[in-house]
Amino acid sequence: MSSSIESATVSLILAAPGVKKDETGAPLGAGEVVVVIAQEKLGAEPGQVSNILVRGVGENVLKIRPDVHLVAGRAPKPGTGECLVGKGIAGNFRGMALGEKFELKKNRPVEVVGVFEAGGSSFESEVWVNIETARTAFGREGMVSSVTLRLDSAAKLDAFKANVSTDKQLQLEVKRETTYYEEQSQGTALFISGMGWVVSVFCAFGAMLGAMNTMFAAVAQRKREVGTLRALGFSKFAILFSFVVESTFLALAGGLVGLGASLLLSFVRVSMMNFSTWQEVSFSFAATPSLLFGSLAAGALMGIFGGFLPALKAARTSPIEAMRG
């Protein structure tokens, strides 16, 4: 957000070899202005505000970012005070519902004419206005914060990067947009990951204690059964193995219930501060196949460790003592 690129430089970048053209021959790229504004959040304490990122974009923004789609309303008309809002903030801030108006700055009102989605990315927590509207409102005439463009193919990225990065006149750094936002969200992701691990460790420890307590109770109730099996010739290892397997399957059953409950979180949106841009970001949790299988594996391990000591106690039980009850 702190970078400044002159409009003349934008034209040089878009004229570079490898930039993709649309059906009219115009380059699929544009300069963008990025500014953070404070806006009153609905449902919070009166007067409480949160930071919202406003992005000044070109008329071809939906062509530059084909993964962004309108889910309500229409695209803004060029040269008007109209804007789009991401579905993550639409209706959650004063004046940001479809058809409402809010001020970018004092006496700079804009009207929300459309709501867009962007595959769950941070774009869904932004306001998009015409770049000239943003420049005028925030005093950025003749300047942009960044340049976003599409290339003919991903294979041309290295050549384009070398062409732009080595140009001393431009003095710019080229990055994939996904890479840039991954770097921007590292602080937030690290915080969420750290909190998640702390909660997971405590929950795992509690789950193992619960499994251990359950299996100790099961061993005590089935003491005669264990003695009978030992008298019939079943080895200590067979007894131990059977109780560990039982504990593991019980843990897996609990894990499946937990996974079912966690999948419901995909329908819940959470808001928090991005520590790099200081904007409020709205997101939802996505359960990937690897995460689901990893969770089940962790549940199985908790069942194994939680059931081992009770199983060991059962295996060491004397057949005669067990038969006496």
Model-assigned labels for residue ranges:
Residues S153-M208, A218-A220, L229, F237:
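Peri-transmembrane interface segments
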Residues S266-F293:
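Short juxtamembrane loops and helix-capping segments at transmembrane helix boundaries
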Residues G29-V36, Q48-N60, P66-T133, R140:
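Hydrophobic secondary-structure segments that place a key small or acidic residue at a functional site
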Residues L209, F216-A218, K223-V270, G294-G306, ...:
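Transmembrane alpha-helical interface segments in multi-pass membrane proteins
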Residues S193-G194, R224, F237, S290, ...:
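Residues that define the loop-to-transmembrane-helix transition and helix capping
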Residues A137-D152, G196-F202, G233-A251:
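Hydrophobic alpha-helical transmembrane segments
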Residues M1-L53, A72-R74, G79, T136, ...:
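Hydrophobic, regular-secondary-structure patches
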Residues L312-G325:
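Short cytosolic juxtamembrane segments of multi-pass membrane proteins
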